[in-house]
């Protein structure tokens, strides 16, 4: 399970180094191909990073969307159209393509945010803006009325 947020820096080639605290979990969820990941775009403006095994059922569901329904087409274009298989190198770095970096406005400072089965990768400024908006909300979304910490 991937959880927690980490402020990271992309190198000059657009590579992101996976923090050591996530490496063991990544290996456990990705076996036998621990180095095989999928990067794709999310409509909120971030990137999604999935172990290939976790991505496959999502890709299959998206591909089953009705082809001629415009409401589904945008999701297919983003999730499948931007999807790229990436490998983790020996130094635990993931290369983010120029197209995906442009989509998410990624610069050197980025945020890697664990989401259980996958990670989100955010432009640091966009992430901070999202957090401010979230903490300014006073109402819980439907279904969370009984949620307590």
What is each residue range found by the language model?
Residues 25-26, 57-58, 127-131:
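Short, charged/polar, Gly/Pro-enriched secondary-structure boundary elements
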Residues 14-18, 50, 92-96, 100, ...:
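Short, structured motif recognition centered on aromatic/hydrophobic residues
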Residues 84-93, 98-107:
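Beta-rich strand-turn-strand
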Residues 29-45, 105-122, 126, 139:
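A short beta-strand-loop micro-motif that forms or neighbors metal/cofactor-
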Residues 28-30, 61, 107, 133-134:
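Residue-level signal for well-ordered alpha-helical positions
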Residues 3-45:
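A positional/architectural concept
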Residues 125-149:
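Short, Lys/Arg-rich amphipathic alpha-helical interaction segments
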Residues 47-85:
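Helix-adjacent hinge/juxtasegments
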């Amino acid at each position: 399970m991937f959880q927690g947020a980490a402020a990271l820096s992309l190198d000059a080639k657009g590579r992101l180094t996976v923090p050591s605290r996530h490496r063991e979990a990544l290996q456990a969820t990705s076996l036998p191909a621990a180095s095989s990941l999928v990067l794709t775009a999310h409509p909120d403006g971030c990137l999604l990073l999935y172990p290939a095994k976790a991505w496959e059922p999502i890709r299959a569901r998206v591909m089953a969307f009705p082809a001629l329904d415009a409401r589904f087409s945008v999701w297919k274009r983003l999730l499948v159209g931007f999807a790229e298989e990436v490998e983790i190198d020996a130094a635990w770095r993931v290369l983010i393509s120029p197209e995906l970096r442009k989509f998410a406005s990624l610069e050197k400072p980025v945020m890697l945010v664990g989401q259980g089965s996958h990670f989100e990768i955010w432009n640091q400024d966009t992430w901070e803006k999202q957090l401010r908006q979230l903490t300014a909300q006073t109402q819980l979304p439907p279904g969370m009325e009984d949620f307590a910490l």
